[in-house]
Amino acid sequence: MSIPYSTSIAQVLDKHLRIRHNGTWEYVEDVRIKNGGTWEDVKEVYIRHSGSWQLVHEGEHFLFNHTLNGNSQSEFSLASWISGQGYSGNKIKGALTVNNLQQRVNLGSWSSDSRVYLRINNNDRISGKGGNGGQRGQNAASNGQNGQRALYTRVGFHLDNGGIIAGGGGGGAGGRNGQVTQQVTETNNCMKGNQCQNTYNVTNNTNGGGGGGGAGYPGGSNGGNGAQNGQSNGGGQGGSSGAGSARNGGNGGGLGQNGSNAENNQGGTRGTAGNAIDGWSYRISGEGSGNGDRRGNSVN
């Protein structure tokens, strides 16, 4: 059988034997030998070159080529998809193409000789969900929620990023409630038909603003009281407070950015941005469009 992906990807993923067929060199998926009258699959093929044996073909790996189409707000798990294809081993080699707006991708954990070619097409994206904005409060305005990471991997991968890989933005902090004191003057009838003025202070409670939702897919929800939801490309604005000592809510963070604290840091705490990639040390190479547009940290 032929391999399920292009020749150029096969060259990157490596360890595919080629044969000459009808005048053309072609990569093959399986190599078989006849042993005792029976054809058997070969696990590995070595050749002797310059006095050393070199591995040129890996025959145990599950080969795949899968494209994500149609926007999805559910995490894509490569392990779950491969299991659905009927493979239960731990050796894989293949290509995954993101052709949509995808909330999170998990490449999983596989054998040390497994490899994935990850392509994000132009104008497409892997994005974490944005963090929700915090709610206003008197003594304990709530914190903004953290944004989600975009890509997780514990398998070696080649990155061809023509789109965006972005952690979700952190939610803005909720602003504290407060009070406002106003001077009130009243005119009343007093002795002998005269009018007298009385002046006194009135104190009323005022509401703080909610935190804005962080950017992501989907964007984070607002924390109420005038705050805005996060969108796929930007964080929501924090809500405005009433007068006096109440404080505005913090803005939601953009893609890969932390949210903002409440006005004068009086309220909850901002949410932090999700990582763009958790598993950066597993990156083998940048191919095609290379590392591309990554918003948020690349860690581990």
Named regions from a protein language model:
Residues 1-88, 283-300:
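Enriched but not universal
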Residues 66-76, 97-110:
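N-terminal extracellular ligand-recognition/capping segment immediately after the signal peptide
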Residues 83-89, 110-111, 155:
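Extracellular and analogous surface-interaction loops
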Residues 91-93:
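Exposed extracellular interaction/assembly regions and N-terminal maturation sites
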